[in-house]
């Protein structure tokens, strides 16, 4: 391969339900480190002006929190209409940024703050997925899904980390799309 990276993560997740169909999750601590163990050829990155591509191949520290909500009224072993809704919101870098600005300043010649010598990401990301199954009779159903999201980098970051970007495509189609 042209590069190698190691992904390390740690976190605490609280999950609960308040009804038969609704569930929640909260990750107050969500830490990820993307370590470029074998960086990309500098000549390759030097030939592009795409900041998103360049930042995708940097070592990054991602520390934040996330919240998720799920609603699913499909019953096992029963036919019938069903609705599935998933909402997620995630923010990273804000607590680190507040501490950095209060007590430190960026190293000379650098515009970005670091933690443990690694630039940290600062962004907000949210997404929503809604799917619906309508039984038309017997073993026939009409099924649809809508999915969308928004991600925005700010503060200490000029782009959202590659692992948090949205993309189109999959294993069977639309492979030509890029993040």
Residue ranges: model-predicted function:
Residues 2-6, 96:
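Solvent-exposed loop/turn segments connecting transmembrane beta-strands
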Residues 2-3, 14-16:
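C-terminal structured domain segments across diverse proteins
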Residues 11-13, 21-179:
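C-terminal outer-membrane beta-barrel translocator/porin domains of Gram-negative envelope proteins
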């Amino acid at each position: 391969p042209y590069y190698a990276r190691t992904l390390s993560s740690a976190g605490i997740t609280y999950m609960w339900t308040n009804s038969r169909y609704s569930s929640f999750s909260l990750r107050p601590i969500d830490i990820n480190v993307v370590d470029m163990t074998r960086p990309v050829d500098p000549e390759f990155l030097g030939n592009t002006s795409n900041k998103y591509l360049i930042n995708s191949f940097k070592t990054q520290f991602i520390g934040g929190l996330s919240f998720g909500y799920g609603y699913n009224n499909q019953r096992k072993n029963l036919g019938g209409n069903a609705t599935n809704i998933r909402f997620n919101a995630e923010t990273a870098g804000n607590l680190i940024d507040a501490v950095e600005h209060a007590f430190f300043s960026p190293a000379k010649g650098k515009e970005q703050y670091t933690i443990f010598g690694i630039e940290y990401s600062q962004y907000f990301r949210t997404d929503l997925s809604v799917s619906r199954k309508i039984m038309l009779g017997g073993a026939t159903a009409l099924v649809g899904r809508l999915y969308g999201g928004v991600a925005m980098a700010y503060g200490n970051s000029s782009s959202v980390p590659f692992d948090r970007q949205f993309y189109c495509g999959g294993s069977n189609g639309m492979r030509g799309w890029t993040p």
